């Protein structure tokens, strides 16, 4: 969808044009994005929150067994399966409270968070490394430093570049879990996980990590070092690959008056566009089925059972649904009767919760075209967890630009909270999005879909940041599992809370799920 401007933007100079060309961003794209600052983004029109029986499947034990069998059959066929892990996230936010403690005027832990960190420090998977670094830098081990009241020395050794540098590393490279044979990072846990549900009949496990350029070499080195032992232990062969967000997905920043934000040297300021930029990386992957899960949502081996079961359940739901859609598409090509097309329309409503406002009146060529459009597109099965706390991003039935209603994963920023009815829909949501997706990326003829064409560009959002002490507006691209997959066939499946164990703060590593 092209956003037209009311007034032409004559705000770029020759230096800007060279900068845009270097990043691979067209002037047209730049002007469209600058226009977004003026126009903003519309809220989505909601039909309601999804729930069990209304957009969210809750398979019975018998159905679950069928889905698990379907996935087992599929992965033993001639299909390429890839595990895709967004892993560029820095760990700095994990240590926000410890950075604050290091800068505090007091020297001994005072807050509950600080006390919890030090009281449990000997349980941390990184304890042995930290202890060795303390001995190297301070000539004392952790117990001796704590006995001396040198709490900050321990924290600075953990976070600083002379020590473990955990304050600057990405989460994927930190030691999360202890085992008798040593500690494991999330990268390693994802490799092991891949062997348990994404191994093809040839024994190959394809794992792709998206990383930031400055950490890529560290990821590659750790993967090269660790993969052989996990391959041997799980009778697998790994194909591990990496990619970075493309410079062409960076977005311009704006001043308060919506003019381009310029740096001190006069150049335009661009910022990473958020996880929605990864739709380009996903589009570069040649695979039939792709599993997507965030880097920090991992558990030790003793708790992997639920994760593995429900990943396979999601995949089974997906491949069974896809097989049915493919059969219908072939039927449409051969020539389907009006009655058969009405059955397909009913299938879209019953199985995919995809409704056309004029569905009852669609017939003939119009119905054929509608079915072809809705059946022949990327598909995804998304795990949804029952809300236990405050509602966050979650599953909804929302209106699309063509007037149809379909399942969408929405963030609170996409919903008009000033509208009491919409706010109530958000607050009544029974489930949240844990980022647990299984995606089908090829059509019924075996061709890859071009994923960027299924993005809804009107689902980005504007956030407020600062640079060099100056306020700026930042443009966030449609989120990877939000607007970037807006025009996909989407089904939601209930999964248990036990499959969702993210690490948001360092103290989360002391929770039972990470021991």
Sequence positions of predicted segments:
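Primarily single-stranded nucleic-acid-binding OB-fold modules
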Residues: 353-380, 389-393, 404-410, 416-515
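Non-catalytic interaction surface on structured domains
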Residues: 2-4, 72-73, 499-501
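Domain-scale recognition of functional cores that engage charged ligands
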Residues: 17-24, 35, 49-388, 397-409, ...
């Amino acid at each position: 969808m092209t956003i037209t401007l009311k007034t032409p933007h004559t705000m770029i100079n020759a230096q800007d044009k060279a900068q845009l060309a270097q990043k691979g961003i067209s002037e047209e794209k730049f002007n469209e994005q600058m226009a977004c600052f003026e126009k903003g983004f519309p809220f989505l029109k909601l039909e309601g929150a999804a729930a069990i029986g209304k957009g969210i499947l809750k398979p019975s034990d018998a159905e679950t067994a069928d889905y698990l069998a379907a996935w087992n059959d599929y992965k033993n066929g001639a299909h390429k399966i890839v595990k895709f892990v967004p892993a560029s996230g820095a760990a700095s936010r994990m240590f926000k409270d410890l950075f604050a403690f290091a800068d505090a005027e007091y020297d001994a832990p005072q807050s509950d968070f600080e006390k919890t960190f030090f009281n449990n420090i000997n349980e941390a998977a990184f304890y042995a490394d930290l202890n060795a670094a303390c001995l190297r830098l301070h000539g004392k081990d952790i117990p001796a430093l704590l006995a001396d009241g040198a709490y900050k020395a321990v924290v600075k050794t953990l976070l600083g570049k002379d020590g473990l540098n955990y304050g600057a590393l990405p989460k994927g490279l930190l030691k999360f879990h202890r085992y008798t044979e040593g500690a494991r990072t999330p990268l390693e846990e994802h490799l092991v996980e891949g062997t348990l549900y994404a191994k093809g009949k040839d024994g190959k496990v394809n794992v792709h990590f998206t990383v930031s350029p400055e950490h890529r070499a560290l990821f590659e080195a750790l993967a090269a070092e660790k993969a052989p032992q996990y391959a041997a232990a799980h009778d697998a062969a790994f194909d591990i690959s990496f990619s970075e967000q493309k410079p062409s997905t960076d977005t311009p920043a704006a001043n308060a008056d919506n003019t381009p934000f310029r740096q001190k040297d006069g150049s335009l300021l661009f910022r990473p566009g958020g996880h929605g930029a990864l739709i380009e990386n996903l589009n570069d992957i040649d695979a039939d089925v792709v599993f997507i899960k965030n880097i920090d949502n991992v558990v030790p081996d003793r708790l992997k059972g639920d994760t593995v079961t429900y990943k396979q359940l999601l995949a089974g739901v997906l491949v069974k649904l896809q097989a049915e859609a493919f059969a219908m598409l072939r039927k449409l090509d051969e020539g389907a009767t009006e009655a058969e097309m009405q059955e397909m329309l009913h299938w879209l409503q019953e199985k995919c919760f995809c409704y056309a406002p004029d569905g009852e009146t669609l017939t003939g060529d119009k119905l054929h075209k509608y079915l072809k459009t809705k059946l022949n597109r990327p598909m995804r099965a998304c795990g949804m967890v029952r809300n236990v706390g405050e509602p966050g991003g979650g599953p909804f039935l929302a209106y699309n630009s063509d007037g149809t209603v379909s399942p969408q994963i929405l963030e609170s920023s996409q919903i008009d909270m000033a509208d009491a009815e919409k706010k109530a829909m958000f607050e009544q949501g029974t489930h949240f999005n844990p980022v647990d997706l299984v995606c089908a990326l090829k059509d019924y003829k075996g061709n890859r879909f071009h994923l960027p064409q299924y993005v809804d560009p009107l689902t980005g959002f504007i956030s407020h940041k600062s640079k060099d002490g100056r306020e700026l507006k930042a443009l966030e691209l449609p989120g990877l599992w939000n607007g970037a997959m807006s025009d996909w066939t989407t089904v939601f499946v209930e999964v248990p809370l036990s499959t969702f164990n993210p690490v948001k703060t360092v103290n989360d590593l002391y929770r039972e799920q990470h021991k």
